[in-house]
UniProtKB/Swiss-Prot annotation:
Its main location: cytoplasm. The keyword Membrane does not apply. Keywords: ATP-binding, Cell cycle, Cell division, Cell shape, Cell wall biogenesis/degradation, Cytoplasm, Ligase, Nucleotide-binding, Peptidoglycan synthesis. It comes from Pelagibacter ubique (strain HTCC1062). This is UDP-N-acetylmuramate--L-alanine ligase. One of its GO terms (cellular component) is cytoplasm. Cell wall formation. Pathway: Cell wall biogenesis; peptidoglycan biosynthesis. The keyword Iron does not apply.
Length: 464
């Protein structure tokens, strides 16, 4: 994907260290744009960008945009950010990440993955299937793919596989040729006033798919299913464990290292087909659904069964999606990004289905006060497949609002509603001490959250 560009434009990314922003910045740099950026803290995403000779400043100050001609902001940037204020004073064009993403993929054949949960894994599975073909797509993902050790890759063809984030509504600007809607859940209510508003935006997005494209909608999800009658055209295929799905998942088998299933395909005007013994090196029915979405797209555009099965079987994974990080005294420790009740429940369901006899311990760090306030009851019900929960302090992500209830009472709600043993820790050192003194033998420990819990998990071997 190559575009001739005005070399005089300097594009500044405010909040360049985020996974979505860093991936977009990398693609634009490799396309030939003059890219720079800033963030308040350094991280691995920024280190990857520096290897591509992208200038990055660790601070937010108006001096950073002195030469910028275009500004791109992440959804995390507040109105009082000095760079955003200066950009407005200078009357520079200011784009949200989703708006800029839409601009750069406007001339490609786009497979756009949307939904509340499962976007990153689904995008990654699609990328793995495509990697076994002669097609060379551009990839823009919300997580780091182990196969390419990055969240983005500039391809040579006119295909683009991208994850579109619904958190600020900007995904509506992305032009889909094919779209996947994994599910719709109560999330980002600080932006959407209601579930009705969220659903209506998804309807608008699906209706943007052209006649020569297709949408793929998981009807295991009730909110997704509710959309079908409200779409303008029946230009979609359904998938899921519902036997009325066009891509019907059946004969599921879950082992400790992989999942296996058959997929019955029933498309209007076409001969029925079954792909048998699909092997996936991921746990959980949620990941079987994610892989089915990828298969549905691949089948529709004509990729062969053998290539599809090979792409899934040889999937290298994506960082922070149930990654095994170390083993200590026969206990396996995993890291996962789950930070919403639905995600926590699905991950634990998958772990329990594969590890029926092992004790499952979940280390949970809530992410954002607002999310915990909004979904307090749902969180308390989401740990039923665990045996033990270790509850960490809330990672506030800079929020300064009041919780509105005692944190100890939330812990009691988890014990009552999920029927687990629960322990609270104050920091990573107390966590390490607890693990050192109490956890050994054949157990599964999963750290969950979108804050610092991943770093805590990776530092545990040095502390225990």
């Amino acid at each position: 994907m190559k575009i001739e560009l005005a070399k005089t434009e300097i594009i500044h990314f405010v909040g360049i260290g985020g996974i979505g922003m860093s991936g977009l910045a990398l693609i634009m740099k490799r396309m030939g744009f003059n890219v720079q950026g800033s963030d308040v803290l350094g991280n691995k995403n920024i280190e990857r960008l520096k290897k591509d000779k992208i200038k990055i400043t660790i601070s937010h100050t108006k001096k950073n945009i002195a030469k910028a001609t275009i500004v791109v902001i992440s959804s995390a940037i507040k109105n009082n950010n000095p760079e955003l204020i200066e950009a407005k004073l200078k009357q520079l064009p200011i784009y949200k990440r989703g708006e800029m993403l839409a601009n750069i993929v406007s001339l490609t054949k786009n497979i756009v993955v949307t939904g509340s949960h499962g976007k990153t894994t689904t995008t990654s599975l699609l990328a793995s299937i495509f990697s076994k073909t002669k097609l060379d797509p551009t990839i823009i993902n919300g997580g780091v793919l182990n196969a390419i050790k990055n969240s983005a890759k500039l391809g040579k063809s006119d295909w683009c596989i991208l994850e579109a984030d619904e958190s600020d509504g900007s995904f509506i600007h992305v032009p889909p040729t094919y779209s996947i809607v994994t599910n719709i859940d109560r999330e980002h209510m600080d932006f959407y006033n209601s579930m009705k508003d969220l659903k209506e935006l998804f309807i608008k997005f699906i209706n943007k798919v052209p006649s020569f494209g297709k949408s793929f909608i998981c009807i295991d999800d009730k909110n997704n299913k509710d959309l079908l009658s409200k779409l303008k055209m029946k230009n979609y295929y359904t998938y899921g464990t519902d036997n009325k799905s066009n891509f019907y998942i059946k004969n599921i088998k879950q082992e400790k290292e992989y999942s296996q299933y058959d997929l019955a395909i029933n498309l209007p005007g076409k001969k029925n087909l079954t792909i048998r013994k699909i092997k996936l090196p991921l746990l959980g029915i949620h990941n079987i659904r994610n892989s089915t979405a990828a298969i549905a797209v691949a089948v529709t555009i004509g990729i062969s069964q053998n290539i599809i099965k090979k792409g899934l079987k040889e999937f290298k994974g994506v960082q922070r999606r149930f990654n095994k990080i170390f083993t200590h005294r026969e206990t396996n420790f995993y890291d996962d990004y789950a930070h919403h009740p639905t995600e926590i429940r699905e991950v634990l369901n998958g772990v329990r289905a594969a590890y029926k006899n092992e004790e499952v311990i979940c280390i949970f760090q809530p992410h954002r006060i607002s999310r915990l306030k909004d979904l307090k009851k749902e969180f308390s019900l989401s740990f039923k497949k665990a045996d033990v929960v270790i509850l960490c302090p809330i990672y506030t992500a800079g929020e300064k609002i009041k919780l509105g209830f005692k944190y100890n009472n939330f812990a009691k709600d988890i014990v009552k509603n999920s029927k687990v043993r629960l322990f609270m820790v104050e920091d990573q050192y107390q966590l390490a001490k607890f693990i050192k003194n109490t956890i050994f033998g054949k157990k599964i420990v999963v750290g969950m959250g979108a804050g610092t819990i991943s770093a805590w998990m990776r530092q545990l071997p040095e502390l225990i």
